[in-house]
Structures are given as C-alpha cells and as structure tokens.
Curated annotation (Swiss-Prot):
This is Porphobilinogen deaminase. The porphobilinogen subunits are added to the dipyrromethane group. Its cofactor is dipyrromethane. The lineage of its organism: Bacteria, Pseudomonadati, Pseudomonadota, Alphaproteobacteria, Rickettsiales. One of its GO terms (biological process) is protoporphyrinogen IX biosynthetic process. It catalyses: 4 porphobilinogen + H2O = hydroxymethylbilane + 4 NH4(+). Monomer. The modification S-(dipyrrolylmethanemethyl)cysteine is found at residue 239. Gene3D superfamilies: Periplasmic binding protein-like II, Porphobilinogen deaminase, C-terminal domain. The keyword Glycoprotein does not apply. It comes from Ehrlichia chaffeensis (strain ATCC CRL-10679 / Arkansas).
Amino acid sequence: MNIRIGTRGSILAIAQTLEIKNLLNRYFPEISVQIVKIKTSGDINNQVPLSAIGGKSLFIKEIEEALLMGKVDLAVHSVKDIPAFYCEGLIIPCVLKRNSPYDVFISSKHKDIKSLPLNATIGTSSVRRKVQLNYLRPDLQVVPVRGNIDTRILKANVGEFDGIVLAEAGLIRINRCDVIKEILSPKIMLSAVGQGAIGIQCRVDDHSIINKIKVLNCHQSYVCVMAERSFLKTINGSCDTPLAALAQYVNNDTIHMSCMLANEKNMVFASCCFNECDAEKSGINMGKKLMDELSQYY
C-alpha cells in the first residue's frame, strides 16, 4: 500500500509532514509513504494581507482539491490555518499531540514587549495579535508582515521592525527557538484557534485511511481543538475576525477554555470549565455569549 501525503512546500509544512510520515512508518512499516508538495494560493500571494485575497482557506484550497480528486490520500495542516468550514466530503479524524499554543516576541534590540520604546513598530499580519497588542500597548504601531518564518525573522533581525510576534510551535518545529526573546502569556496574548496543533485531513469515505491515522490521534488535543473550533464556527470567524480561544485540560476529564472576540472598538473575554463530553457544546455557548456581549457595545 502507498499513502500520498499532500502538503505545502514551506519549511514548516515539510517539517510537520515529515513528523506524520515518520509516525506512519513506525506504526505501519509495510506501507510506502510519499510526500506530495502542493503550491497553494496563499504561498503564491505572499505579499498581500490574507484578508484582502480570500483568507486562510488559501493555504489549503489546492490541497483539498487534490484530496477530493484522489491525487493524494491525506493532507497535513496547521489547525490554525483551517477555516471554520472546509470542503464537503472531507474530514479531520486526527489531531497530533499539541505543541505549544503560545505566541512569542522576537527582536534584535529589545528583551520583551514591555521594554519596547514609545510608538515602537511591531510586525504581524494577524488581526488577533493586533487587537491584543493595542489593548496591551495602545502606542504600538502594528504593521503587516508576510512571508515564511525565516523571512519574518530576518526582517526583525535587520531592524525593519522593533519586533515581531510569531507562534512558538512553528519555531520549535524548525529548530529556531534561539530567536525567542519572550513567551507571551495567554493573559496578554490569547492563542489562535488550534494554534500549535497539526491536523490530518482525508476523504470522509476513505475508511481504510481513517482507521490507520486514528492511531496517531491524541484524544486530549483533539477534544480541545474541537471545542475551540466550535467557538470559531459559531462566530463564523475568518482571518479578518479578531478572535482567540485556548482550551486546556485541568485534570483527566475537565477542560478550561478562555475566549476573546473583538471589533474595531471593543474587546470581550470569557472563560469557563466543562467536562470533555461537553466540549463542542461549550464552544458553541462561548461563541454565542461573546457575540451577545460584543453586540451590546454598538
């Protein structure tokens, strides 16, 4: 049997896909695993803000098309890049054990965000990060930055920005933790939905593949990601919606989740604890609660 894995060709995407390939080889040594690099619209249009050209779905569109056409058997995605609703006929039955869900601050000049001078320039194209940075430091000038991780690190190192904010998990996966100056607490920078998690997507009727990749699934990571994605779906959030959610187990079956939703003028937060069997329902309830609270500011 041969399994073809569809993935983007970036350094980070290949690192994530190799992790899946190695796991499949470990569990199923008799199977041949092939990596198929697919260039996505998000990779091609890497100088334009995502919100201006179609959002996060641009990072998975061509890969999902390859899946549906049978050109690949499964796809590997950063869960935070998966939009609220993806192609009919596909399923994500597996989430690997989650890496760090936190954001980090990188700078060639400053040790942390607190030490940045007045009106310092921070690079990030994430509206989620922008609203939280401006809530923390209204003086900061937050400007867009696109490109792969190495490109963004280089821009920080040559002084194009006073600092940038990136996901810690990506830096861990490409062995670039040396550039981290500060790991940002979720109290000041709440994570993107699914941040730090790798999801495996396949065709909903491909039961042979589904049964195989389920052995790679981390139950707790999957449940937390589904709770966060229920929040995302309820809001129908996209890459230009300032929202955040982080669900984490506090014991064997109890989860704590914090969520944020914002508009141009206001930001609202909420948190709750729930049993894992209520994960998706709790995500829906949190979404409704924050939408209702935010609507009261208009």
